[in-house]
Curated annotation (Swiss-Prot):
GO molecular-function term, one example from the UniProt record: acyltransferase activity, transferring groups other than amino-acyl groups
Signal peptide: none
PROSITE patterns, per the entry: GNAT
Name recorded for this polypeptide: N-acetyltransferase Pat
Domain N-acetyltransferase: 5-148
Substrates-to-products reaction catalysed: L-lysyl-[protein] + acetyl-CoA = N(6)-acetyl-L-lysyl-[protein] + CoA + H(+)
Similarity comment: Belongs to the acetyltransferase family. GNAT subfamily.
CDD domains: NAT_SF
Activity under varying temperature: Optimal temperatures between 70 and 90 degrees Celsius.
Binding site for CoA: L79, V81, T87, G89, G91, T92, N118, K123, K127
Activity's dependence on pH: Optimum pH is 7.0-9.0 at 75.0 degrees Celsius.
SUPFAM superfamilies in the record: Acyl-CoA N-acyltransferases (Nat) (SSF55729)
Lineage: Archaea, Thermoproteota, Thermoprotei, Sulfolobales, Sulfolobaceae
Length: 160
């Protein structure tokens, strides 16, 4: 399926596709994304697509936007994948793309906040090696990019 998934940077012209994606999400999905039920406006979609104070990437399957991920200047990111396209690795691909973008931008840390019941996001965080902290009403995931590279290098190093 990964061959059919296209990850690309959003452009201002993508706002309608982003708006359609968010309007196709269930109330539960919107609650998990925003921590409360919120339906985005056209203006919200235009802001997401603008890349003004963040960078947004889209996941497309057969030309249809099925996922969106935004990375902010402080390293915090958000992610949403339409329910019908979960378990295909789209969320993981989007987060990996954000990690690479963060490295290119010189960020030392990427992080996310989610609700304890957002198991898909928690699974992605664990799979990619985020340090996870669980609180009563939220989960915090953090990856120090320089630390991750060091750990990968040490893990691949073999003593003579």
């Amino acid at each position: 399926m990964n061959d059919q998934i296209k990850i690309r940077k959003a452009t201002k012209e993508d706002w309608e596709k982003i708006y359609q994606l968010y309007n196709s999400l269930s109330d539960e999905d919107l609650y998990l994304r925003f921590f409360h039920l919120y339906r985005i406006t056209e203006e919200d979609a235009k802001k997401i697509a603008s890349n003004e104070d963040h960078v947004t990437f889209l996941a497309e399957v057969d030309g249809k936007v099925v996922g969106e991920a935004s990375l902010h200047k402080d390293g915090e990111f958000s992610l949403v994948v339409h329910r019908n396209y979960r378990t295909l690795g789209i969320g993981t691909l989007l987060v990996k793309t954000l990690i690479e973008e963060a490295k290119k931008s010189g960020l030392s840390t990427v992080k996310f906040y989610t609700l304890p019941e957002n198991t898909p996001m928690i699974k992605i965080g664990r799979k990619l090696g985020f340090k996870m902290r669980f609180y009563e009403d939220e989960v915090y995931g953090e990856m120090r990019l320089t630390e991750r590279e060091l750990n990968v290098n040490l893990a691949t190093f073999s003593a003579p």
